[in-house]
Amino acid sequence: MRQTFMANESNIERKWYVIDAEGQTLGRLSSEVASILRGKNKVTYTPHVDTGDYVIVINASKIEFTGNKETDKVYYRHSNHPGGIKSITAGELRRTNPERLIENSIKGMLPSTRLGEKQGKKLFVYGGAEHPHAAQQPENYELRG
């Protein structure tokens, strides 16, 4: 009798990947990173278990936008007080806080559940080319597109 393989915490191998965001389009990079964080690039993917790998994104400040998104795309947040809405364009956010731009994009593609939160904690984004995770011996990951 054959049994379907179901991954659990004891039989998951996690790797560390470094992805260079220089010259990459924001959405294409984000969708691929979200897929790696969820573990969908593995044959052992199981929907209810966190089978994903750790991802380090470097050069976040050199991400690219297509079209007029740099000036036309606006991010809003609200403080829940009357008149407390704040807005910032994508280009301005890239100049001031490029890490938050990529984190918000990727975490928006993960599930809004406890499992999605757990998967989102395996993402590390840095604006420059340096990162403090050399001890984990991360592998370079080439994007498909």
UniProtKB/Swiss-Prot annotation:
Name-wise, this protein is Large ribosomal subunit protein uL13
Cysteines paired by S-S bonds? none
The subunit field of the Swiss-Prot or TrEMBL record says: Part of the 50S ribosomal subunit.
* Biological process, per Gene Ontology: negative regulation of translation; translation
Role noted for this protein: This protein is one of the early assembly proteins of the 50S ribosomal subunit, although it is not seen to bind rRNA by itself. It is important during the early stages of 50S assembly.
Identify the keywords attached in UniProt to this record, alphabetized: Ribonucleoprotein, Ribosomal protein
Give the CC-aspect GO terms. Answer: cytosolic large ribosomal subunit; ribosome
Q: Which family does it belong to?
A: Belongs to the universal ribosomal protein uL13 family.
Q: Which domain of life is it from?
A: Bacteria
> What is an example of a Pfam family matching this protein?
Ribosomal_L13
A GO molecular-function descriptor: mRNA binding
